[in-house]
Amino acid sequence: MKNIIFISNLMFLFSCGFYSMAGSIPPHIKSIAIPLMDNQTAEFGLAEDITDGILDEFNEAGILRVTDENSAHSILRGTIKKVSEGPYTYSKQESVSEYRYKIDVKIDWYDVSQEKNLLEGTYSGFGAYGLSGDIGSDGIDNDNDGKIDAEDDDEFGEPRAFATRVAVRKIAEDILNDIMTTW
């Protein structure tokens, strides 16, 4: 019986124990630069918010070393193309009870040594917010995590600003996932 458990553990270790998403990135790319996004919208501070969100995702994942453009193996450039905001849900009285805030960003991931784009695409993220003024008690799942108000410890702050953070986080996660899995 001990031999069966030992062999099972060995099989597990050698089958999936050493899997790494970093193996799907071209092997010569070890670092990435993420300069400030261009902003083609009237939203003040959005370029900084999205750039910081993407930097946070890459630093947390630790897949590529984040560095400056002069020493990077790859560069992730982006342009905020559009911000839209409109009614998302309505009450029984047919008045707007929730708004949807959406951001569209065009991204290019460039390989410096090969002088070519590795990934191009448009990414969108959205967040929802109500009109109550307090997202901690508005009865809305503002960040789409399945938790509402008192159940959700990260729902606080000004509603529209929180919706922006949710949209930025979604965009950053999607970009990182595509970079890690496209190859």
Give the positions of each predicted feature.
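Acidic carboxylate motifs that coordinate Ca2+ or other divalent cations, activating on Asp/Glu
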Residues: D138-D145, D149
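Acidic-leaning, charged glycine-interspersed low-complexity segments
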Residues: L131-G133, D145, R165-V166, A172
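A structural "domain/chain start" motif
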Residues: L13-A72, E85, S113-K116, R160, ...
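N-terminal hydrophobic targeting signals that begin at the initiator methionine
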Residues: M1-K2
